[in-house]
Amino acid sequence: MPAPALSGPQYLREGLKLVLSPGLRLFVLLPLAINLVLFVGLIYFAGHQFSLWVDHLMPTLPSWLSFLNYLLWPLFVVLVVLMVFFTFTMLANIIAAPFNGFLSEKVEVVVRGTDDFPAFSWGELIAMVPRTLAREMRKLGYFLPRAIGLFILSFIPVVNLIAAPLWLLFGVWMMAIQYIDYPADNHKLGWNEMLAWLRQKRWQSMSFGGIVYLVLLVPVVNLLMMPAAVAGATLFWVREQGAEAMAPQQKVTRS
């Protein structure tokens, strides 16, 4: 009997338990160190530029509407925070992609209780680098046109008032894609097939992406939550019957 599906927060909570377990802790340390170095550097840079970015994005209002500045300023602060968050998350996941893919493999072994993946070796990890980086570039190709569109929208007066909510929705969707793609890619599921499967599981995907998005906004906590999100996404793949998404692809391959 298959294990029951969970909610987004439950997947993340169970993922955190998994990465803190003795058998998986070792596979978390290296990506955690990479994320820490990147996080410190980005926070240092953003801290020096934050006010300047907010001022550039804020629309210039006539004097009789100047009182609106007090209402709009928090909105544009949120917008800058979201943009910094996106930058950190995308860079961290590109750099740590091979380690995250490998962590996802090991989590799936623990969850399923069977090991269908090759035994660990540094050669195997190195061999994963081209495939995982190519997949990250595919994600970047999906992300950038949409992010650029939202970025341009942020500079259009009046219309830019909806930029922050749109960034939020897009961010939630991207978090689902970013992390659930690790187990999907380990099983060689094509990019378009993976997106189609996530759309079929839209509400479950948005629930998981939403909680991941929320916890990754919390400084320091986000460093540990990134590997927890990888583990939670792998559990999502197993519990939500991700293998079913591979059936059409396997039929095409056989034919």
Swiss-Prot record:
Cell wall biogenesis/degradation listed as a keyword: no
GO cellular component, one term: plasma membrane
Cystine residue pairs: none
Record key words, sorted: Amino-acid biosynthesis, Cell inner membrane, Cell membrane, Cysteine biosynthesis, Membrane, Sulfate transport, Transmembrane, Transmembrane helix, Transport
Main location: membrane
InterPro entries hit by this protein: CysZ_sulfate_transptr, Sulfate_CysZ
Pfam family, one: EI24
Compartments it resides in: Cell inner membrane
Transmembrane segments annotated in the record for this chain: 26-46, 71-91, 150-170, 211-231
Bilayer topology term: Multi-pass membrane protein
UniProt key word Endoplasmic reticulum: no
GO molecular function: high-affinity sulfate:proton symporter activity
GO biological process: cysteine biosynthetic process; sulfate assimilation
Family of the protein in this entry: Belongs to the CysZ family.
Role, per record: High affinity, high specificity proton-dependent sulfate transporter, which mediates sulfate uptake. Provides the sulfur source for the cysteine synthesis pathway.
Protein's name according to its UniProt entry: Sulfate transporter CysZ
Organism: Pseudomonas fluorescens (strain SBW25)
Gene (name only): cysZ
